[in-house]
């Protein structure tokens, strides 16, 4: 079937191409903490290549830089700083129970 004879013509949606997360001038290095921290989740896990939208080579360099920074203790291995909110404590009710002997 010819394109001009289609019953339901497809509407052309415009899209904006996203900027790459790593610019050409950025060096992927274990000391570049501002760059590395963009590729780590809140728990401290390395985000996947699909989430990061980087090439395979860039992902390998990021992974090795993160691991190197972890070993040199520039980054934590896990980020599990749970912030507990203390609610007001309720007073304990003591019952006057006696044990049977």
From Swiss-Prot:
Subcellular localization(s) per the UniProt record: Plastid, Chloroplast
Tree of life domain: Eukaryota
Keyword annotations: Chloroplast, Plastid, Ribonucleoprotein, Ribosomal protein, RNA-binding, rRNA-binding
A GO term for molecular function: structural constituent of ribosome
InterPro entries in UniProt: Ribosomal_bS18, Ribosomal_bS18_CS, Ribosomal_bS18_sf
One term under GO cellular component: chloroplast
Pfam families with a match to the protein in the record: Ribosomal_S18 (PF01084)
Matches recorded under PROSITE patterns: RIBOSOMAL_S18 (PS00057)
Transmembrane stretches, start-end: none
Record-level GO BP terms: translation
Record-stated family: Belongs to the bacterial ribosomal protein bS18 family.
Record's subunit section: Part of the 30S ribosomal subunit.
UniProt name for this protein: Small ribosomal subunit protein bS18c
Organism: Aethionema grandiflorum
């Amino acid at each position: 079937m010819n394109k001009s004879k289609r019953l339901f013509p497809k509407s052309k949606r415009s899209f904006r191409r996203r900027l790459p997360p790593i610019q050409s001038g950025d060096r992927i290095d274990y000391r570049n903490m501002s760059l590395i921290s963009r590729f780590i989740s809140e728990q401290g896990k390395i985000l996947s290549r699909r989430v990061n939208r980087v090439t395979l080579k860039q992902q390998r360099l990021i992974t090795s830089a993160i691991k190197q920074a972890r070993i040199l203790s520039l980054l934590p291995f896990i980020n599990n700083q749970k912030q507990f909110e203390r609610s007001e404590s309720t007073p304990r009710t003591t019952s006057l129970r006696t044990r049977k002997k």
